[in-house]
Design a protein with these regions (language model features):
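Glycine/proline-rich low-complexity spacer/linker segments in large multi-domain proteins
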Residues: 96-102, 133-174
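Extended carbohydrate-recognition surfaces in non-catalytic/accessory domains of CAZymes
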Residues: 1-76
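Beta-strand-rich ligand-recognition modules
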Residues: 92-145
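Short alpha-helical segments and helix-capping/turn motifs at coil-helix boundaries
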Residues: 65-69, 78-79, 111-116
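Solvent-exposed strand-to-loop "edge" motifs in beta-rich extracellular domains
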Residues: 65-67, 85-87, 133
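Aromatic-lined ligand-binding clefts that engage carbohydrates, nucleic acids, or primary amines
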Residues: 71-97, 128
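Generic N-terminal low-complexity/basic-hydrophobic segments
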Residues: 1-27, 154-191
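N-terminal regions that are enriched for targeting/export leaders
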Residues: 32-50, 59, 80, 84-87, ...
Length: 194
């Protein structure tokens, strides 16, 4: 395997690992007319589509336990965050019982996101609750919504892999790139042989 093939395979493996990261999939939900739901009313989320009509309120919650590692990266001390797709309605987020995000319309926590823990402590459990209210002019038979809890370290890795990949594409377009890479490979092989 050439150095270029090895690097490409490693970048793909890292990219795949970042794309497959998960917050555990233990979200539960209630769809009602707005009142705070009873404990027994919550059901496990099994998809991203919620059948709903105008005026319905979607409550989502999870108990997220900070893992020791995410994508083989240590999590201790890292920032943990909540993000989701954009939802054009009122939205409120509570972390550990404290209201941390509240908008009357157009809930967008794709960026900026909502901090769950500034400095993660592995083993600690955080309760996250989201309340989404469908707008009065809502049409359709439901909506798609997906919330995700992530780790800043994994995001930083994803950005680094993507940025490095783009830098390699740019470098490959420059004249003399192959000759330069061949020279670097020869030099590295000579150093390894010594």
């Amino acid at each position: 395997m050439t150095a270029e093939e090895l690097l490409k395979a490693r970048a793909e493996a890292l990219g795949g690992a970042v794309q497959s990261r998960s917050d555990g999939g233990n979200w539960s939900y209630v769809l009602n007319r707005g009142e705070t739901p009873e404990e027994a009313a919550f059901a496990l989320v099994t998809g991203t589509f919620f059948p709903a009509v105008e005026g319905d309120v979607l409550w989502l919650r999870t108990a997220y336990t900070v893992p020791e590692r995410a994508e083989d990266l240590p999590v201790a001390g890292e920032r943990i965050y909540l993000t989701s797709n954009v939802f054009i309605c009122a939205g409120t987020v509570w972390i550990d019982g404290e209201k941390v995000f509240d908008v009357p319309y157009w809930m967008d926590i794709t960026r900026p996101d909502v901090t769950v823990a500034e400095k993660a402590e592995p083993g600690r459990t955080h309760t996250v609750c989201i309340r989404l209210t469908l707008p009065r002019l809502f049409t359709g038979d439901g909506f798609h919504y997906l919330a995700h809890i992530g780790c800043q370290a994994a995001d930083d890795l994803a950005f680094s892999v993507a940025a490095f990949s783009e830098e390699l594409r740019y470098a490959a377009s420059l004249p003399g790139t192959q000759e330069t890479l061949d020279g670097i490979r020869r030099e590295l092989c000579a150093r390894i042989a010594d």
